[in-house]
Amino acid sequence: MDYENDPGWKYLRRSREEMLQDQSRAYDSKKNVWIPDSEDGYIEGVITKTAGDNVTVSIGQGAEKTVKKDVVQEMNPPKFEKTEDMSNLTFLNDASVLYNLKARYAAMLIYTYSGLFCVVINPYKRLPIYTDSVARMFMGKRRTEMPPHLFAVSDEAYRNMLQNHENQSMLITGESGAGKTENTKKVISYFAAVGAAQQETFGAKKAATEEDKNKKKVTLEDQIVQTNPVLEAFGNAKTVRNNNSSRFGKFIRIHFSKQGRVASCDIEHYLLEKSRVIRQAPGERCYHIFYQVFSDYLPNLKKDLLLNKPVKDYWFIAQAELIIDGINDKEEHQLTDEAFDILKFTPTEKMECYRLVAAMMHMGNMKFKQRPREEQAEPDGTDDAERAAKCFGIDSEEFLKALTRPRVKVGNEWVNKGQNIEQVNWAVGAMAKGLYSRIFNWLVKKCNQTLDQKGISRDHFIGVLDIAGFEIFDFNSFEQLWINFVNEKLQQFFNHHMFVLEQEEYAREGIQWTFIDFGLDLQACIELIEKPLGIIAMLDEECIVPKATDLTLAQKLIDQHLGKHPNFEKPKPPKGKQAEAHFAMRHYAGTVRYNCLNWLEKNKDPLNDTVVTVMKASKEHALIVEVWQDYTTQEEAAAAAAKGTAGAKKKGKSGSFMTVSMLYRESLNKLMTMLHSTHPHFIRCIIPNEKKASGVIDAGLVLNQLTCNGVLEGIRICRKGFPNRTLHPDFVQRYALLAADESIIGKTDAKKGSALMLARLVKEKKLEEENFRVGLTKVFFKAGIVAHLEDLRDQSLAQLITGLQAQIRWYYQTIERKRRVEKITALKIIQRNIRSWAELRTWVWFKLYGKVKPLVNSGKIEAQYEKLQETVATLKDTVVQEEEKKRQLQEGAERLNKETADLLAQLEASKGSTREVEERMTAMNEQKVALEGKLADASKKLEVEEARAVEINKQKKLVEAECADLKKNCQDVDLSLRKVEAEKNAKEHQIRALQDEMRQQDENISKLNKERKNQEEQNKKLTEDLQAAEEQNLAANKLKAKLMQSLEDSEQTMEREKRNRADMDKNKRKAEGELKIAQETLEELNKSKSDAENALRRKETELHTLGMKLEDEQAAVAKLQKGIQQDEARVKDLHDQLADEKDARQRADRSRADQQAEYDELTEQLEDQARATAAQIELGKKKDAELTKLRRDLEESGLKFGEQLTVLKKKGSDAIQELSDQIEQLQKQKGRIEKEKGHMQREFDESSAALDQEAKLRADQERIAKGYEVRLLELRLKADEQSRQLQDFVSSKGRLNSENSDLARQVEELEAKIQAANRLKLQFSNELDHAKRQAEEESRERQNLSNLSKNLARELEQLKESIEDEVAGKNEASRQLSKASVELDQWRTKFETEGLIGADEFDEVKKRQNQKTSEIQDALDACNAKIVALENARSRLTAEADANRLEAEHHAQAVSSLEKKQKAFDKVIDEWKKKVDDLYLELDGAQRDARQLSGEAHKLRGQHDTLADQVEGLRRENKSLSDETRDLTESLSEGGRATHALSKNLRRLEMEKEELQRGLDEAEAALESEESKALRCQIEVSQIRAEIEKRIAEKEEEFENHRKVHQQTIDSIQATLDSETKAKSELFRVKKKLEADINELEIALDHANKANEDAQKNIRRYLDQIRELQQTVDEEQKRREEFREHLLAAERKLAVAKQEQEELIVKLEALERARRVVESSVKEHQEHNNELNSQNVALAAAKSQLDNEIALLNSDIAEAHTELSASEDRGRRAASDAAKLAEDLRHEQEQSQQLERFKKQLESAVKDLQERADAAEAAVMKGGAKAIQKAEQRLKAFQSDLETESRRAGEASKTLARADRKVREFEFQVAEDKKNYDKLQELVEKLTAKLKLQKKQLEEAEEQANSHLSKYRTVQLSLETAEERADSAEQCLVRIRSRTRANAEQK
């Protein structure tokens, strides 16, 4: 049977891998220790320092603790990790025992041996270790063969009983809740199963009669098991610790016959807790039977028992808990009632028992009251008393009278004594307790009667003792004294038994030892309790002393024993919840404080004799009379005395004076006497914690129980002896390293070798002689010596391994050198072959050989195909023939089966006389044999034919598969040929098309070049014109900037101008007379208008010409774009086919020099391609490799061509882009011209309107001219101030540029550092990959060594078993030899003393004895030789195993060190990754800031250019205006000669002044804002620069520190890796296995390199951007110098602009307002944009958080789904198993029914035969004796058949029962799986709902983000609108400048 496949095996013994893992931890016997801890009992520590009596211990996580040496306890080597027997521990101490139990309990290994003890810890859950399969494992096995288990101890007891013919006992002790009752039940079930198995064996040997089978419907084993429900119902209750606690002790004796069959059973009980009937503590409950009665299992039971109240109203049982979680009282009552039936309780007995239970509940509700002024109690209501009396079957009045006024004897008379209420209540409680105790006694007696089977001899028994363990509570009373006294007795029994066995072994081994009886250690405490004048004697004495109290008892005890007895002490003051104590007693488990309250009453246990008399007189209740039958009241004793019967008198006296202590002591003495007559086995139950939590150990609680259970006491005894022992061969084999020379002797003589080895160790002062003893077969060691030997062995082994490693390294380096030389030679050969192939590949004959060879092979393939087709046809014919033969054989078999069936039918139908039946049966049997022979032959032939048919079918399938493969290959070849031809045609077509396109492209390129030259000339001209226009605009802008200073004065002038205009309106009528002059002026204006129109026509003509050219160019561009798109489509197709050829693309990129060279090279390549294509047609039938090569060449060529096309496309696109730029410039010029045209048209209209008002302005011209002169001076002053501010701005801008350059340089340095960090990171990752590969290789090697070690260990175990068998044979031979010697000595003494034998006879006897002795000696020598050989083999294998194990350990250590280093590498790399990521983030931030600053700088530069242009324009305008002002001044000085011209100019100047004023306002505001922005930018740049410098300094320092640290780490790692590489060179043998992993890692490395390259590209791009910014800054500096020059020129021209100022003011105001509106809207949009950005950032963070949560939820759902699928799989498996079992069950039922029918048929046949036998007997004279004899034989045969079938039916029924049980188990498992599935389904639904909710939230967040994005886009649109408005304002300013230029040209 494969034990390890059993589901319960993992809870019994660890696997080999787990053992090796546990035993591989580091250990130092001198440093690893245990130290006390308040929570965990003991914790592990390492001694770091010793100072006097104190030691400093490191306890993990850097913590240290200083303790005294006395409290430190040694730690055992890893060899003893989770050991199954704690007595083998080399350091036997409390800490090691606790740790071993804790470690095993954590692995759910709940059973552990401790010498003779079996310690079991309550697991608080169901474990599959009590099943039938587990029980069968342990049957018949030795204790050492199997893991610790209750069944192992039970089976050992059973085997000892059968083999030694000695009674056995199993002592199960422990605290309440530790699992005593459950273990007792398991023991009883195991013995019942073993007995039943023995019963089946016995029944198979000797058939039972039908009468016996009918009688025995319920087996004895079932009845034994069914005693548990009855005893648990009446003796178990809920306590705080245990829901089913046994409140009594029991000793169950199971009697067996000599054959091992269960014969009978009887039960004895002890110390029943009677007080629980009337009193329960909080959290506890009364006995189960009281609550089962209320469960309504029997519907009318409560009515019959008069229980008409709820259970909570019955005082005796309702003082605490009423229900128990997890226990159904109804189901329990059903089990109890069924057990009553199985145990043969009659319905009347059951009912009477229930009635007595109900009567006690009614008694608890009886109430009494005190009569006024009397010491007399009376009933307070009689309903409950009447119900109780009815249940008792007595009169209620007599019952109440007996309670309130009992009869007592006063002198010689009997009188009724009055009782007070306290006495009555005490009497009621005492009666209830006494009655329940007697009911329990009756139940046990009844069970014993049922289990007392007759007819089977009771030769031996196994007793199971289930009794409470030692108890130390806060309040210890009379009950605790007796429980502790019993445990003292049991511990003394154990100590005596344990060391008797121990010292018997010492005597057998012949070592020196002084006998010690450790049982005497407890004798003092036992004598204190039970001896005369002891506690029990004084308690009994006080019970008969008048007026004695509990205090007088306590005082007498103190006076008698305090200070006189060592175990009697004065109690210490109470602590915490402890109660007051009267005295203390020192037990083996500790000192217990006892309180004497109520001891006298509990000991006397008085009963009301009058009530007992009333109950004994019951006529309706037989049970109550029976339970009180043995009780003799005082009246009965007096009556018996009066009659003069001495026996009665003696009986009455003993009944009156028997105390509880006397009864307990009597039963205890019987128990101990019985145990002393048995061979004991000890089981100690442990409760792990008070919380009933599985897997949790409360160290203090467990240590206390180990003390109370005697486990630690047993360890104390072991320490005084030699607890560790090793066989001589094992010792020699394991420690041969310590004394190699002496160990050689040990191979032949193990004992001598062991002695010599130990002597050498003593001589070397490594051991002391008193620490060990050498026995006959074993070496005995004191505690701790084995650990010392292990340390010595490890040291020697380490030295040997070091030398071995050096040799191995040298050997592998030699192999590596040889391998490298071979590799170099192979590389040279490969290079030579490749060179030869490169020369041959262009040789024509070699190409021809390549073409011809496939054709030769194709011909062979066709021939092979034809042969295969012929073979297939042959095989098909053979298959058809074989199928026909098979069909014929099947028909013959069917025919034979049919004939057999017919013969059987005829056989059944034949019913004649006995002789005819016999003859027919004989004939039928012969025919049957013949037919069976034929059938067998036919079956064999059929099997042969079927095998042949199967083989033929296999061959047929193989041939068909080969044919199919050949067909497929042919088809593939044809398809490949067709595909190659099609590809060739397509390639040729593509090549021709591409050549045509190339020619077209060349033509187009030449045309484009010509057009480009022409366009460049035109662009040059346009560029010159644009430069001139820009210069003019620049001058105007500069003038505008200077005029902005005069805005404030201009505003005042505007107000005055408005007033003047009002005056002018009044004087309009006066100007009508001057209309003629205006008409003349109009004619002049018409003339100028016609001139302007002619100029406009010329401009329009030029524009039309340019438009035509532009359209032509656009058409050409569209044509080119269309061609390029077509080229792109074709190139895309080529790219799809040639995407994998990167190397060719790089070569093509490097191969082009210029366009003509590219064309020539392309032509050559096309020619090569054509030749390659022709060769491709010829080589179409070659191998796939050649076809692949051809495709590769084609793809390379096509790729080069595609890349050339890409270059052409790029050049064409560049040309198109240039043309597009030119077209855009022309379109812009056209737009400007159209705008100027519209402007001129508007000016003309305005001039026409201004003529009407010129007359009004003449009078004011002089006054305005004078005002202009004043304002001009003011404007000059403001212009000077503006120039100074502009110079300041230029200087600040220069500083900003220099700072920007510094920042760029710093960014470059930072990027260089990041590149260095990336290189270092790549280096670390490479080293990490190398270390990982080495670690994986070592782990595989370690696995191989581990497997080898396992195999050797298994062989070693087999050899050990063989040696043990041989040793046993040797011992047997030795015993026979010694026996013969003894007999020889006896004969010799007899001869010498008595002379009964003569000399001849004596010589003959002597010869026989000598002959026997020589034979035995020869056998012994043979056994010794065999043992020596086996030991040698075992030693050799053990040495090999140890060597392999050491090598595996070394590799494991190396692997662990590499793993640690790998983890360190991982940590270092993670830190570097984190730092690099931080640097990337900082770099991104710096680059972002740099981009922002560069953008702002660019914006400032643009604004600066705009301002410069405005200033320059304003300067020009100012100059022109100054000239005009000077001319006007001259004309005014001349008089009114030019009034008309001045009025016209004044009107124009006023309009221009308004426009200039608006432009000036706008320019001034823009300049102010730019100045503020410049200042802010300067401050921000300085702050950013300081922060960046600070960060760079910190990072540089941090980089330097890390560089130093990592350099040191790299150096140390490099040194370590060098040494490790030398040591691990042997692991390169598994390199092939790791190639797949290496490929994957290389792919990952490629991805990482690609990512690194992308990062480097990004860095280079950023560097390019920074360089561009630097270039931009340089250009800005150049422009600044130009601006300074323009500014100086503008200052010279500023005086000219005075006259134009007033007109510019109005326009500048409007522009300023528009600008402010735009700026405010822009600011609002920017703020809104910032808010949206922040919201987007928050939403992005929330989204990422939600994504993380969703990922977590998805992982949870995935785990839940996996667990769900696993549960479903388990459910399906369980369902399939259940279905299979159901099918088996149905099959067994059908078989059982069939057997039943056959049985009935046989019975009818027997009846018929019986009738025939009767008829034959009647006709005996006629038929003769011979017929009768034959009939009787026939009858016996039928009877034997009937018995056989009956046995089969019985076995089938048992099989059916087992199948039913399995079905129920599987149904339970399916239900559990279904529950788990439902739970998982609920979890999945919850997670799904949560996921949906989070998805909804994510969608809402995305919607919100989209809305914000739409808002952002809206703001951006409004911002663009504002920019357009600003552009329109600039255009307005351009118009002003153009007007100014026009006026200047006119003048």
UniProtKB/Swiss-Prot annotation:
Transmembrane segment boundaries: none
GO cellular component: cytoplasm; muscle myosin complex; myosin filament; myosin II complex; sarcomere
Localization, UniProt: Cytoplasm, Myofibril
Binding site for ATP: 174-181
Basic and acidic residues: compositionally biased ranges: 1053-1075, 1125-1155, 1231-1245, 1516-1529
Region described as Disordered: 1047-1075, 1119-1161, 1231-1253, 1516-1537
Keywords per UniProt: Actin-binding, ATP-binding, Coiled coil, Cytoplasm, Methylation, Motor protein, Muscle protein, Myosin, Nucleotide-binding, Thick filament
Signal sequence segment: none
Tissues/organs with expression: Found exclusively in the pharyngeal muscle.
Residue ranges constituting the Myosin motor domain according to the UniProt record: 81-794
Residues modified as N6,N6,N6-trimethyllysine: 125
Gene Ontology biological-process entries: muscle contraction; sarcomere organization
InterPro entries from the UniProt entry: Kinesin_motor_dom_sf, Myosin_head_motor_dom-like, Myosin_N, Myosin_S1_N, Myosin_tail, P-loop_NTPase, XRCC4-like_C
Residue ranges annotated for the Myosin N-terminal SH3-like domain, each copy included: 28-77
Pfam families in the record: Myosin_head, Myosin_N, Myosin_tail_1
Coiled-coil segments on the chain, per record: 856-1947
Any one Gene Ontology molecular-function term assigned to this protein's record: actin filament binding
Region called Actin-binding, residue ranges: 668-690, 773-787
Main location: cytoplasm
Family: Belongs to the TRAFAC class myosin-kinesin ATPase superfamily. Myosin family.
Assembly information from the UniProt record: Muscle myosin is a hexameric protein that consists of 2 heavy chain subunits (MHC), 2 alkali light chain subunits (MLC) and 2 regulatory light chain subunits (MLC-2). Interacts with itr-1.
Domains as described in the record: The rodlike tail sequence is highly repetitive, showing cycles of a 28-residue repeat pattern composed of 4 heptapeptides, characteristic for alpha-helical coiled coils. Limited proteolysis of myosin heavy chain produces 1 light meromyosin (LMM) and 1 heavy meromyosin (HMM). HMM can be further cleaved into 2 globular subfragments (S1) and 1 rod-shaped subfragment (S2).
More info: There are four different myosin heavy chains in C.elegans.
Function summary: Muscle contraction.
Name of the protein: Myosin-2
Annotated organism of origin: Caenorhabditis elegans
